[in-house]
Amino acid sequence: MTKLRGNPWAVLAVLSLGFFMTLLDLTIVNIAIPNMLDRLHASLDDVLWVLNAYALVLAVLVITCGRLGDLFGQRTMFVAGIAVFTIASAACGFAPNPDALIAFRAVQGLGAAMLMPQTLAMITVIFPAERRGAAFGVWGAVAGAATIAGPTLGGLLVTAFDWRWIFFVNLPIGIGVFIASFLLIPGIKTGRRPKLDIPGVILASAALTAICYGLVEGQQYDWGTITGFISIPLIFVVGVVLLALFLFDQRRRQGGEPLIPYALFRSRNFSVMNWVACTLSIGMLGIFLPFTIYLQSALGFSALKAGLALMPMSLVMIVEAPIIGRLTDKIGGKYILMTGLTLFAVGMGSLVLFAGPHSTWYDFLPSLLIAGLGGGATFTPLTTTAMREVPPMLAGAASGVMNTTRQVGSVIGSAAVGALLENRMSVTLTAQASKQAVALPPSFRAPFVTAFRQAATNLTGGAPAPHLPPGTPHSLAAELARLGALTFTDGYVPAMRETMILPIGVVVVAAASCFALKQARRRPTDLAAPPVPAQTGSEGQTPVPGR
């Protein structure tokens, strides 16, 4: 272990495992929603907040935690984040009620916000510019592995045990990463220690909280009044005003110690990549949200089968990402990224065309393989191009900005696509219910149509259970169940197709935006000064080899 301490690839392995945990918890909980509703006696709103509490805290605090890494050291923040995340995971697993689980998920989001930006920052510091593509290729492969492990591992654990084990699974990983961090990751100094911009932290956190809360809860309140004079539009206005004040305050502080150094955006590639990261997050989450519902609710796949159905795409991404990383180091990321985004959009577009009411998993295979080729050629060149010219002393701030744009993009994608899907479902389910209801006795027709009109607001899907009066013949009950399943499947598919036009279009916009990138030279020169080696001291800091 002593020989491996400070080795860039050993450090990368530890960072990647920590990053893996945070991504795993963004996907694994979705599979457990039905089990939580049953075992925890939770409402649908409770379970949705179990999902949103994690994402909301992560989106709000990741930019601040990135800057804290510059202040206190990336290793210190990474280790603290691992500890918080692991303890919160155990607390989630033992949560006695929905309220406690939501609170512990928020703490888990805090841990993820503490460690996530440090992974990107430390990779930027310990690897020279001409080798970062290979490093980010491994990092991207880990992201692909997490997309597999989330639905698949979640399905296995929920099937074998119950929802609590989707949190307990983090414990051995977290403990292992915590120990390995002290053994393998040296303290890293990147130059003069900055001061923390407290007013900036307060303004940024308040602005992001208001905007993200409005996006997360907007659909719940039909984008209107919450209580009294408080409404979703008012929360948005407050968030936008606070964001404007934050940006003005940051501009005024550029000569001192701002939370976001505007010097980062002098790099055209960094600016463009943040835009692409945001649009890609909107597109990817917007694509997979309706498609996952389709697999489980329309086609009747189990949680495990749904995860396995998506596995071919993720496997292609895992295999391809390291290769793309090395290729990015040689020729730059511009055209690789454009090709990857285009292939991903083509794959998802063909997936929409092939998806039908009676599709099987192998009908999706060609489309998923194309999308996997595109996805594998996306994350590595995106991150490498964005971070190539970032000075090591600003790596934490840059990583915080990148992760914030991604998380906010995910929140926007979830809210926008959720609202659009609900709108289209209200039309298509009502139309299908009216069509199928003609086969029912007259007294059952209106309640049947009304039930499906209301079911459009329940995005976890499935045909609504019929409320049958006493004495209903068994044959009629069976016919209602058959027509209900047929109505939902035939109504959901066109709603999904119409909805997915939006996120696929956003991915196309991301691909077109790459025309604005500057293509890197074949042997790029890092514009940043090299990191200042730390001296061994009380924190165990040692020099980090650059090559």
Regions found by a protein language model. Name each.
Residues I179-I198, G218-Y221, F248-E257, G356, ...:
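Helix-loop junctions on the cytosolic side of multi-pass membrane transporters
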Residues A149, G155, I293, F364-F452, ...:
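Small-residue-rich alpha-helical segments with characteristic i,i+4
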Residues T64-L208, Y213, E217, F229, ...:
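Helix-loop-helix hairpins in multi-pass membrane proteins, especially solute transporters
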Residues N7-L58, V62, A100, D162, ...:
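Transmembrane core module of solute transporters
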